Amino acid sequence: MPPSSTEAIQDLIDVVSRLRDPDGGCPWDLEQTHASLVSYVLEEAHEVADAIRHGDDAHLKEELGDLLLQVVLLSLIHI
């Protein structure tokens, strides 16, 4: 049985938290800042918009996932 939406979101948060963990996390993820991620967020937002404009629901689902990943990553970077 697939996880509920709430469980899936928590799983994503857990994965990104591990990537950002100072003890063994991913070096690339650890060095990211809000400012360094701006271009990635904009790119994903444009890809979401393109999928909407083209009526490509399958691609939209994929791009929304990519944008959500960026939102979670941004939210786990402490200000």
Q: Predicted regions: what is each one?
A:
Residues 77-79:
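Conserved small/polar residues in nucleotide/adenosyl-binding loops
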Residues 70-74:
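Alpha-helical scaffold segments in carbohydrate-active enzymes
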Residues 62:
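Short, charge-patterned binding micro-sites
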Residues 1-59:
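Extended low-complexity intrinsically disordered regions
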Residues 65-69:
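Glycine-centered tight-turn and secondary-structure capping sites
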